Amino acid sequence: METKQIVIYPNDILSTPTKKTDLETAQKIAVELFKTLNQEGGLGLSANQIGEDKSVCVVNVTNPFFLQNPKIVKKEKEIIYKEGCLSIPDKMITTKRYEKIWVEADNIDDTMFF
């Protein structure tokens, strides 16, 4: 199974805002993201990490899912966290995260869900 190449930092696409996308495009990108994520062994992957400028990401913690046009709308309790990133290989980075976040994203029927 051929997978997409992971974009490595400091490639500009990693810091360029992504664009909203339609469901059909999001689903196609999500398939590529899951294939690449499974091959590389991460917990999550965004479209810009495989060279796509679309607002799509996948998460594979307990039950795999993808988000189309996600937007963080609420954050709770900032923490400092050390984590890895597939776009910054072989390094652990200390970064700000939150214990909880609330996300809005487009649903399969093109409505919003939380």
Q: Where do the language-model regions lie?
A:
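Positively charged
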Residues: 1-114
